[in-house]
Design a protein with these regions (language model features):
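A short acidic Gly-Thr/Ser loop motif
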Residues: 1, 58-60, 186-193, 199-202, ...
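Nucleotide/phosphate-binding catalytic cleft detector across ATP-hydrolyzing
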Residues: 2-185, 203-205, 228-276
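A conserved active-site cap/scaffold subdomain adjacent to cofactor or substrate pockets
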Residues: 211-232
Length: 277
């Protein structure tokens, strides 16, 4: 819910095992629909409210971004820039893109505007001029994947009100404006994907999603130690570090503590080397 101070208040949470998705890409729409339905049902039960529309966070290696510009003439006779002029300018950014048929625009995020000879304008509304130009970061995604998500949500009994790419959603949730102004990189490591968002001078410079996550580290540990995935995950969480120099070469981990069927001691330094690699 939106509280009186305009901040969001969490009234319900729902979770479900992520099935039918591999590295951020839907591979089984029916399994995704069942997971969405279960998570939504739990959230509705906790909150006491039903919801027929949701906001969707998009991820996957098909998420790409590129710079683009758009130009329009200021519409008012007195030359004052209106919200409609800004909207038309961003629409022109999208219109000037040459995208293949299998991709579509998710966001056109303005970085700065130029009004005649005035550059690096953050918000041109209310200013006066003749020619308005927008410099934007355009985020695109796979049309097929977006449609697959929409179909899965419909099967789950809901619809997407709007979509936002995961790196941008994560940045909006955890970064302060001062951090964006100073410049920072937000890296979000998930189970099968890792996303990043790069900010400088308050602007989003770049975002990306890579098909590598913490699950790949777990798999590497399982192979390196010749143990099960469950034991490898437990070892990673309790003893894992990406810097071998943080641990002593004589430190050892007893695998039998995680599974009675496992035997032997392994070097924690070796575990760190696997994670670092």
């Amino acid at each position: 819910q939106v509280a009186e101070d305009a901040l969001l208040r969490v009234v319900g949470v729902g979770e479900a095992t992520s099935l039918g998705v591999r590295r951020g890409t839907i591979v089984d729409a029916e399994a995704v629909a069942k997971a969405c339905h279960m998570a939504l049902e739990h959230a509705e039960r906790m909150s006491g409210h039903a919801s027929d529309r949701v906001f969707v966070s998009l991820s996957g290696a098909d998420i790409l971004c590129q710079e683009a510009t758009g130009v329009v003439a200021v519409s008012r006779a007195d030359g004052e820039v209106s919200e409609d002029d800004v909207t038309r300018c961003l629409g022109e950014v999208e219109a000037r893109l040459s995208l293949p048929l299998n991709r579509e625009v998710i966001h056109a995020l303005p970085r700065s505007y130029r009004l005649d000879d005035q550059k690096d304008i953050k918000d041109p509304v209310g200013m006066r001029g003749v020619r308005l130009e927008a410099n934007a970061l355009v985020v695109t995604g796979s049309t097929a994947q977006i449609k697959n998500i929409g179909r899965a949500l419909e099967q789950a009994g809901t619809q997407a009100e709007a979509s936002i790419v995961e790196p941008l959603a994560a940045a909006e949730a955890v970064l302060h404006q001062k951090q964006k102004e100073r410049g920072c990189v937000l890296v979000n490591i998930g189970g099968s994907t890792t996303s990043l968002a790069v900010y400088e001078d308050g602007n989003l410079l770049h975002l990306a999603v890579r098909p590598v996550g913490s699950g790949h580290i777990t798999n590497d540990i399982a192979i390196g130690l010749r143990t099960s995935i469950d034991v490898a995950e437990a070892v990673k969480l309790q003893y894992g570090t990406a810097n071998p120099h943080e641990v002593g070469k004589r430190e050892e981990v007893d695998l039998s503590l995680f599974d009675a069927h496992e035997e032997g001691l392994v070097s924690r330094y070796h575990i760190a080397e696997i994670i670092e690699a």
